[in-house]
Every structure is written in C-alpha cells, then in structure tokens.
C-alpha cells in the first residue's frame, strides 16, 4: 500500500486508515517518499500491468492518464475524521475522506465594478475528471499553460460556453 508522502497533510490520514481498516494483516505500508516517487510508482505499475494500491489525489494529470478506481469507503464521518488527521490518534475509526470544496470568491467592489466578470466566475465549474484529462494531455505533450488552456477551449466547449454569453463564446471560438 503506497502511502501519502511524508510531511503531507494526508500522511496521518492514510496511516490511521491503514490501522483502522486492519490492512497490516494483508498489506505492507510503503512510504512514498515524495509526490514524484508516488507518481512514478503508479506509472511503473501501469506499464507492467501490475496492480497498484495507494493514495492519490485529484484532479491531477495522473488521475487523467491512468484508469484509476476510487476505493469505496464509508461516508465521511466528522467525529472519526478528527482522529484520522491526528498522527497520535490512539484508536482510529474508519471514515471516508472529507470533500475538498473549491470556492470562487470576489470582493464586493468587483461585483459592483465588473458585474460581467463576477457573473462569469459564479458560473465557472469544471468536473474533476475533465480537469485531470486536460492536465494529462498537457503533461503527455509537454505543453505550456497557454497550450493547455487552448486545448481546453477547443476540446471542452460544452463546459466553458455555459459560463459566457453566446456572443463571447463566438469570439473565443473565432480566436482559436
């Protein structure tokens, strides 16, 4: 079981879930060392057609590149999670992971001075799977951020055109 890289916030959670789920009877916990080492471990397992069990997060290029399957877990339990995040938790109990919420915030004056921009930002949403796929394309192609953005605009029109008025979408399409 490839654990979270040492020093990362996920480290006590993965270590405590390892204990709470009684995985020591079946799996050896392997510390990843770093994010890059963890990424390389996944790539190596995939290239060898070997199974991989471990921690990873999304959205990322790795999730977009490989056919990863999220392990089923019980629902998030706030009380159990408090102990999971504590490296010194004496009796960890199982909980699903807390959902990371992404919020778009603007200062009040922006809403007043640039209501069109504020409206655009309020509509902006991209599913994690799509972000991961775009990041994977960028990594596979050694793309610059501008190239990745252009790739997104060309290939994910159904998403971004919901954020802008039709005339703006037409201008963006014409510029591509």
Where in this protein do the model-derived segments appear?
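Ligand-binding pocket segment of bilobal, Venus flytrap-like solute-binding proteins
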Residues: 4-84
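Domain-level detector of nuclease and nuclease-like folds
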Residues: 39, 98-100, 107, 120
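A bilobed periplasmic-binding-protein/Venus flytrap-type ligand-binding module shared by bacterial periplasmic
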Residues: 100-113, 136-137
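Stable alpha-helical elements in mature extracytoplasmic
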Residues: 10-14, 38, 42, 113, ...
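Short, well-ordered beta-strand elements
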Residues: 1-2, 121
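Metal- and O2-centered redox machinery and metal/ROS homeostasis
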Residues: 15-27, 37, 51, 89-91, ...
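C-terminal functional modules
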Residues: 119, 123-176
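Soluble non-cytosolic domains of exported or imported proteins
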Residues: 5-9, 32-36, 111-115, 125, ...
